[in-house]
Design a protein with these regions (language model features):
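Catalytic adenosine-cofactor/nucleotide-binding cores of aminoacyl-tRNA synthetases and other
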Residues: 1-166
């Protein structure tokens, strides 16, 4: 659905006329985005999931099944608070965030490359699993110790890419 504010914003932007006219449908989506920008809480989602297995989980986090993480509910409005979620040994990433043979300028996950899991840790890809058709079914990565977001020394390892996960 659309918020009342977004419909008002669309009407304000397009105006009214006695003559017939067309308004691009994308204008409604833009008005909705602009209306929700200041008030909607943020979250992460993965549309086309690919399993990410953190192979050295126990070595870094011990017997902890889940490590707590947090992020601002809205990046520009700290008064909206913080959201909490857990990081575990098996996660889901966007399939497009991994490449067997990366093109030039690809800063996401591929063999030997390091990326930050958004609001999480830095991981380095060590391999992947494929089915009989050659489709990637899982990616294996190792966690780099002491790189958890929000902790001292978290930015000691420089990475070029940050990816979304659930």
């Amino acid at each position: 659905g659309y918020t009342a504010g977004s419909l008002r914003l669309l009407a304000e932007r397009t105006g009214a006329s006695k003559a017939g006219g067309w308004t691009d449908y994308a204008s409604l989506d833009i008005a909705l985005r602009d209306d929700l920008e200041g008030q909607a809480h943020r979250a992460m989602a993965v549309i086309d999931p690919l399993r990410l297995e953190l192979v050295n989980w126990r070595g870094v986090f011990g017997d902890a099944a889940i490590v707590p993480c947090s992020a601002p509910a809205h990046p520009q409005r700290p008064e909206l608070g913080t959201r909490h979620f857990g990081l575990g040994a098996a996660l889901w990433i966007e399939r497009d965030d991994f490449a067997l043979t990366p093109p030039k300028g690809f800063f996401r996950l591929f063999a030997g490359n390091k990326v930050r899991l958004k609001y999480g840790v830095v991981v380095e890809c060590v391999g992947c699993s494929q089915d009989s058709a050659g489709r990637v079914t899982a990616v294996q990565a190792r966690v780099l110790p002491d790189t958890r977001s929000g902790t001292p020394g978290a930015d000691a390892v420089k990475v070029k890419g940050t990816i979304t996960w659930v």
